[in-house]
């Protein structure tokens, strides 16, 4: 509080009121501000903050908009996309809401994606981050170990997110982290062991704090922590964690639980051979995850469990051709740059999908199959300006015949050369 001066009456530099007219006058270097002006400034700041929050809420895509965006990149999995859209919308609504300490506390809801290899778990998480324009990082749970053992500390996951945000901590604190192969850190046996399980239960324990929300100390260069280094501090309260895993064998655990019980109006659950694995997974309960080897505390921190269906042949054909980043569209664009039209026969696409199913790699295996098929023709075409069209047939996929090539006449070749010259100049 400024001291009273008999010779000169002190005034607020903003409103002009004297010290006698206000409760308090705060002195600065050559200026004064009264308590009334401080309150007014606080009100202005609060109003602007509320406007920013309202704008953030208006900009947040609604669940239907989120699903529509996911539909552009991910084929099938409608139920999973709906569940993810609602969960992500609620998560960012919670961050952007003006929740006061005396109101209802909205807890964070991390997500567990459960589905076969190549069913779209990673792609779903990546696409969500792309839509929301937030930093995104992928971590592999199999590389993590408990602190003090050879391997990566869980804090290194956070470092990847910070790096994705260009070291903007505030942005990173609203990012998304996808932890893949989370099923591989299941406890080695259902009963707690007296020996250390440093890559299983130990990692689950280490992840608990950052999943729930804590101020984590992250080594800026990665690697192990040591007491004499500086740390980057990051609050994980608003980071959305999406954990994904195939959880192979969990369908048997679910079946053993519900197999003899009736569902609906006394209908018995069919055997695994008759029942689709995807349908069985829809009946998953926390107790099944517990039996699989996930610890109760971990299960409690990923309350939203989303199951993905195994991909069918038709799904894989659609994945090849329909999404914005479909592999066939990408190859067509690459060929177009060389002035060649690329076509895939329907039987060729069906066979590629069948090969991916046989390998058990799902959508992930499609690119490897296509690269193998396309290598020779992509090597030859740029050097031959007479080629106008390339058709990939079933025989091409089976490697019993090369692609069908259509050659242009001399007039077209001349126009093609002229077009190339124009683009270079």
UniProtKB/Swiss-Prot annotation:
Q: Which molecular function terms from Gene Ontology are attached?
A: ATP binding; ATP hydrolysis activity; ATP-dependent protein folding chaperone; protein dimerization activity; unfolded protein binding; zinc ion binding
Q: Which SUPFAM superfamilies match?
A: Glucocorticoid receptor-like (DNA-binding domain), P-loop containing nucleoside triphosphate hydrolases
Q: Which Gene3D superfamilies match?
A: 1.10.8.60, ClpX chaperone, C4-type zinc finger domain (6.20.220.10), P-loop containing nucleotide triphosphate hydrolases (3.40.50.300)
Sorted UniProt keywords: ATP-binding, Chaperone, Metal-binding, Nucleotide-binding, Zinc
- Residue positions binding Zn(2+): 12, 15, 34, 37
Residues recorded as binding ATP, renumbered to this chain, are 116-123
Question: Which residue numbers delimit the ClpX-type ZB domain?
Answer: 1-53
Q: Name one GO cellular component term.
A: HslUV protease complex
**Biological processes per GO annotation:** cell division; proteolysis involved in protein catabolic process
PROSITE patterns, sorted: CLPX_ZB
Highest taxon, organism lineage = Bacteria
Task: Please describe the quaternary structure of this protein.
Answer: Component of the ClpX-ClpP complex. Forms a hexameric ring that, in the presence of ATP, binds to fourteen ClpP subunits assembled into a disk-like structure with a central cavity, resembling the structure of eukaryotic proteasomes.
Family of the protein in this entry: Belongs to the ClpX chaperone family.
Function comment: ATP-dependent specificity component of the Clp protease. It directs the protease to specific substrates. Can perform chaperone functions in the absence of ClpP.
**Know the name of this protein?**
ATP-dependent Clp protease ATP-binding subunit ClpX
Q: Which organism is it from?
A: Caldanaerobacter subterraneus subsp. tengcongensis (strain DSM 15242 / JCM 11007 / NBRC 100824 / MB4) (Thermoanaerobacter tengcongensis)
**Encoded by which gene?**
clpX
């Amino acid at each position: 509080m400024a001291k009273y001066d008999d010779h000169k009456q002190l005034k607020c530099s903003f409103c002009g009121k004297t010290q006698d007219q206000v409760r308090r006058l705060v002195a600065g270097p050559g200026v004064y501000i009264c308590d009334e002006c401080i309150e007014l400034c606080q009100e202005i700041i609060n109003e602007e903050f509320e406007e920013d929050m309202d704008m953030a809420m208006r900009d947040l895509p609604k669940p239907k908009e989120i699903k529509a965006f996911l539909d552009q990149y991910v084929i099938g999995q409608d139920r999973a996309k709906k569940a993810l859209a609602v969960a992500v919308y609620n998560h960012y609504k919670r961050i952007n809401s003006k929740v006061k300490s005396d109101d209802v506390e909205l807890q964070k809801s991390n997500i567990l994606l459960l589905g076969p290899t190549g069913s779209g778990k990673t792609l779903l998480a990546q696409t969500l981050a792309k839509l929301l324009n937030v930093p995104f990082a992928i971590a592999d749970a199999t590389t993590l170990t408990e602190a003090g053992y050879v391997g990566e500390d869980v804090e290194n996951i956070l470092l990847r997110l910070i790096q994705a945000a260009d070291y903007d901590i505030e942005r990173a604190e609203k990012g998304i982290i996808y932890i893949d192969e989370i099923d591989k850190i299941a406890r080695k046996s259902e009963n707690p062991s007296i020996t250390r399980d440093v890559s299983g239960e130990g990692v689950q324990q280490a992840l608990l704090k950052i999943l729930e929300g804590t101020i984590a100390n992250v080594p800026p260069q990665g690697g192990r922590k040591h007491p004499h280094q500086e740390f980057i501090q990051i609050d994980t309260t608003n980071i959305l964690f999406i954990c994904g895993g195939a959880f192979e064998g969990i369908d048997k655990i679910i079946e053993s639980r519900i197999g003899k019980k009736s569902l609906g109006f006394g209908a018995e659950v069919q055997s695994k051979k008759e029942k689709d694995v995807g349908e069985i997974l829809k009946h998953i309960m926390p107790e099944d995850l517990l039996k699989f080897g996930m610890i109760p505390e971990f299960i409690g921190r990923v309350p939203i469990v989303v199951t993905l269906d195994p991909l069918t042949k038709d799904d894989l054909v659609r994945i090849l051709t329909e999404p914005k980043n479909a592999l066939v569209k990408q190859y067509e664009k690459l060929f177009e740059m060389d002035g060649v039209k690329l076509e895939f026969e329907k039987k060729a696409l069906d066979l590629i999908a069948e090969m991916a199913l046989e390998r058990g790699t799902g959508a992930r295996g499609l690119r490897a199959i296509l690269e193998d098929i396309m290598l020779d023709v992509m090597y030859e075409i740029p050097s031959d300006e007479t080629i106008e069209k390339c058709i990939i047939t079933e025989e091409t996929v089976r490697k019993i015949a090369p692609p069908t090539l259509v050659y242009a006449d001399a007039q077209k070749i001349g126009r093609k050369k002229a077009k190339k010259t124009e683009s270079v100049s």
